[in-house]
């Protein structure tokens, strides 16, 4: 069985998702922020041809390093070509479970799976109404979020974002229909099919989940993954771990809405090499790394932004409050218990936990935007915030000391190189500010660091 044993060991197999048309041109306006084209306004000049050309560099980078690449749409297209009517009927039942109308099995197409049923909106003159696709199931090129593989098997995620709620159903089909994935992977927990009847949804997402090493998993809890989702996933993973591989599973606190650029753990920390981490400065606190840029400067900057907004009589609702970052980066460490995971201890910082456990070197931190030149360097803070928003921290490691990173984050990429990390620069003028190389890859098989 394929497993993932680290974030920076040699990457052997990966799942990617080519959904460029759905990303930019398949979203309907007027249906709320999660489907509105206005949500993409931070990258207003995106065009499908340029974006597709740039996205195509990703599988090239992976294959150059010998990584076996599986792509969602290609898997589904091949499966439909070979499927009998009975097999198509099973697919329809799985994907459209609980949905009133579904395509006839004999008419099922790839477009139905990705874009919804019907495939395209149309005007029906008989009823004098516009008919819309029921749900766009694959509209984002970020398979990291919908499933993740651990030391003990694969988890299908439960998405908190409404626009992605049915995407895991389609992604799970890939694990079942591709012959290699069916043989080499094992789904040990499908969170998308879970209903605990609780007031908080049991959401857990792959962008929040990091396999730090052979015995440690970190899961961010905040805008996407919930505490309920974390606890249930932790329980299921310990249950699946019959050989006792997993020692620690850490819940890492993340800012809540409206701090949208901090929605997942993988936008504030990643691992380019053994004992090293690329981190967003001003986010984590540390008692063990005294020269870490302090969060206090970020909070003071947020205070200034809010004061300026109030002075100018601008709406305050979407402006991040300093309290949104209270406790950010702290972690609760869980170990195997009797009937449920047991809280071992709380740490003021994930960084300090990793240093204490020998999983991260004290001098192994590499900062987004490089190091500040002076104390309370607000210009450096602004640079780090801008590069982080463009996905600077969202690198994916192909093997120890070799990463794929977005090209436009010059300061961060230079800092990686100065610390001995080789960088494959991914052209990103059409791609960044919504997700990066880490989001765009879901490791299926990765060696220990």
Protein language model annotation of sequence segments:
Residues 1-449:
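The feature marks the mature, well-folded catalytic cores of soluble enzymes
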């Amino acid at each position: 069985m394929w497993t993932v044993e680290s974030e920076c060991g040699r990457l052997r197999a990966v799942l990617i998702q080519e959904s460029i048309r759905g990303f930019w041109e398949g979203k309907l306006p007027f249906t709320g922020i999660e489907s509105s084209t206005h949500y993409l306004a931070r990258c207003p000049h995106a065009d499908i041809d340029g974006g597709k050309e740039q996205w195509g560099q990703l599988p090239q980078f992976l294959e150059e390093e010998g990584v076996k690449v599986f792509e969602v749409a290609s898997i589904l297209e091949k499966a439909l070509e070979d499927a009998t009517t009975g097999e198509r009927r099973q697919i329809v039942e799985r994907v459209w479970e609980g949905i009133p109308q579904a395509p006839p099995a004999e008419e099922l197409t790839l477009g139905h799976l990705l874009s919804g049923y019907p495939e395209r909106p149309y005007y029906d003159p008989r009823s004098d109404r516009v008919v819309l696709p029921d749900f766009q199931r694959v509209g984002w090129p970020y398979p990291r979020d919908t499933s993740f593989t651990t030391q003990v098997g694969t988890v299908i995620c439960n998405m908190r974002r409404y626009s992605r709620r049915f995407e895991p159903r389609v992604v799970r089909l890939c694990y079942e229909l591709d012959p290699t994935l069916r043989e080499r992977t094992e789904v040990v927990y499908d969170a998308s099919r879970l209903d605990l009847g609780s007031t908080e949804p049991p959401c857990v997402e792959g962008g929040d989940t990091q396999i730090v090493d052979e015995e440690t998993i970190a899961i961010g809890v905040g805008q996407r993954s919930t505490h309920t989702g974390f606890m249930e996933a932790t329980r299921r993973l310990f249950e699946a771990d019959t050989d006792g591989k997993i020692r620690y599973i850490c819940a890492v606190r993340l800012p809540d809405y409206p701090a949208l650029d901090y929605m997942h753990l993988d936008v504030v920390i990643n691992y380019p090499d053994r004992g090293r981490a690329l981190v967003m400065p001003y986010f984590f606190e540390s008692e063990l790394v005294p020269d870490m840029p302090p969060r206090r400067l970020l909070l003071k900057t947020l205070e200034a932004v809010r004061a300026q907004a109030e002075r100018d009589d601008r709406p305050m609702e979407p402006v991040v409050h300093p309290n949104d970052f209270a406790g950010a980066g702290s972690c609760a460490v869980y170990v195997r218990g009797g009937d449920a995971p047991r809280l071992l201890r709380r740490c003021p910082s994930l960084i300090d936990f990793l240093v204490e456990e020998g999983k991260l070197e004290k001098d192994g931190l590499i900062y987004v935007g490089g190091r500040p030149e002076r104390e309370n360097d607000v210009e450096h803070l602004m640079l780090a915030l801008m590069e982080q928003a463009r996905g600077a921290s969202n690198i994916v490691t192909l093997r120890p000391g070799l990463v794929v990173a977005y090209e436009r984050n010059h300061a961060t990429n230079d800092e990686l190189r100065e610390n001995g990390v080789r960088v494959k620069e991914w052209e990103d003028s059409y791609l960044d500010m919504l997700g990066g190389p880490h989001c765009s890859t879901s490791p299926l098989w990765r060696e220990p660091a």
